[in-house]
Amino acid sequence: MRKFFKYFLFIVVFLFHGFMFSVVNYVFPHYDVTRVTGVEVKRVDKDGPITKSNPADGPTRDVYYINTQNDDGKIMVYRNEDTRWGFPFYFKFGSANLQAEAQALGNDNKLVQIKYYGWRITMVDEYRNATSIKEITADDTPSNPIVSWILYVFLLATLFLSIQFIRGWFDSDK
């Protein structure tokens, strides 16, 4: 029974830390260096984009999209939507301004750095949300998500300490 409880605690610790790694990866900002190839706006409601087959049936909002392609040819689409006061707390209110800036940079085919959070999951139409965009040159060093790295190291340390604590707790009673 003690062995079962020990392995159960290991599983709980691994699941908790896996969840926390996922939260840090989703919520904290990342940076991509790319070129803007286009922008678009879609009117959506709670069911998704409004079309003939999906008419509006409630409050609607505009969702902006920024289409990009990096120098390797990889294409990525970013959602550009206000977070307002909601989670994650980026307090982003200027999506239209960011869209205009992206369009101007795309017209000039300039190299840009996009700061974003979230994941791109194609199967469920989940997009990364762009929070800022800035022009960079090929000589510039791209930004790095330092806070994320610090939290990853912290989570690895707590995972290691949790495992050592559980092992010590159960092995000391032999």
Curated annotation (Swiss-Prot):
InterPro entries to which the protein is assigned, alphabetical: Phage_phiNM3_A0EWY4
Membrane-crossing segments per the record: 8-28, 146-166
UniProt subcellular location: Cell membrane
Topology term for the membrane: Multi-pass membrane protein
Domain of life: Bacteria
Record keywords: Cell membrane, Membrane, Transmembrane, Transmembrane helix
Gene Ontology CC annotation, any one: plasma membrane
The protein, known as: Uncharacterized protein HI_0453
Organism, as annotated: Haemophilus influenzae (strain ATCC 51907 / DSM 11121 / KW20 / Rd)
Classification lineage: Bacteria, Pseudomonadati, Pseudomonadota, Gammaproteobacteria, Pasteurellales
